[in-house]
From Swiss-Prot:
Family that this chain belongs to: Belongs to the aldolase class II family. AraD/FucA subfamily.
EC number: 4.1.2.17
InterPro entries attached to this UniProt entry: Aldolase_class_II_sugar_metab, Aldolase_II/adducin_N, Aldolase_II/adducin_N_sf, FucA
Entry's cofactor comment: Binds 1 zinc ion per subunit.
Name of the featured protein: L-fuculose phosphate aldolase
Pfam families for the chain: Aldolase_II
Residues given in the record as substrate binding sites: 28-29, 43-44, 71-72
Any one GO CC term of the record: cytosol
Biological role stated in the UniProt entry: Involved in the degradation of L-fucose and D-arabinose. Catalyzes the reversible cleavage of L-fuculose 1-phosphate (Fuc1P) to yield dihydroxyacetone phosphate (DHAP) and L-lactaldehyde.
Binding positions for Zn(2+) per the UniProt entry: 73, 92, 94, 155
Catalytic reactions of this protein: L-fuculose 1-phosphate = (S)-lactaldehyde + dihydroxyacetone phosphate
Length: 216
């Protein structure tokens, strides 16, 4: 895809994220790897008003185009691309259940085999840091090295993938897992978990099965 096509795909993903109930207002942000940096949503602009020319290019050193302001979270997007060379897209949102768990500062353990969509046997929750800060970007780099999906304490969710379709799909799956986990926690009962051995079997199967989404 060329820049205009990638920019439109970013906008389409933002609109779909809202349609799916994963985000609201101007919260959240989306990016794709481009050249030596990334294309990312602008700061503070409602998704339905975005045009392709509003999407901002930020190079690998964090320098952005003149007369454009990238999302305030551009630092952690860049940290994902630096940490995971295979990642070509990043989706960040404040979905209800993921944000709820993040407020509790709880990772999602192996409550269900689909936790393995993260690429590991749990979904981490990284420590709180102010949005847009270098410290938050550092926490994200540590967490995303371990898992393709991470919760940000008192904040929300980040997912990454080979393309935007996969990153958005992963965000949907993690939101469902978060909703299950919150409901389980509300029972006050001890929650049985899958063992590391059981999750390793699932992870092995996912390597050969995988998610086959071709970006449109």
């Amino acid at each position: 895809m060329n820049r205009a096509e990638l920019s439109q795909k970013i906008i389409d993903t933002c609109l779909e994220m809202t349609k799916l109930g994963l985000n609201q207002g101007t919260a959240g942000n989306v990016s794709v790897r481009y050249k030596d940096g990334m294309l990312i949503t602008p700061t503070g602009m409602p998704y339905h008003l975005m045009k392709t020319e509003n999407i901002v290019y930020v190079d690998g050193n964090g320098k952005h185009e003149e007369n454009k302001l990238p999302s305030s979270e551009w630092q952690f997007h860049l940290s994902v691309y630096h940490t995971r060379p295979e990642a070509n897209a990043v989706v960040h949102n404040h979905s209800i259940h993921c944000a709820g768990l993040s407020i509790l500062e709880k990772p999602i353990p192996a409550i269900h085999y689909m936790v393995a969509v993260s690429g590991t046997d749990h979904i981490p929750c990284v420590p709180y840091a102010t949005f847009g800060s270098h410290k938050l970007a550092s926490y994200v780099a540590t967490g995303i090295k371990e898992s393709k999906a991470i919760l940000l304490a008192h904040h929300g969710l980040i997912t990454c993938g080979e393309n935007l379709d996969k990153a958005l799909w992963l965000a949907q799956e993690v939101e469902v897992l978060a909703s299950w986990y919150l409901k389980l926690l509300s029972t006050g009962l001890e929650i049985p978990l899958l063992s590391k051995e059981q999750m390793q079997v699932v992870l092995g199967k996912f390597h050969t099965y995988g998610l086959r989404i071709e970006e449109s």
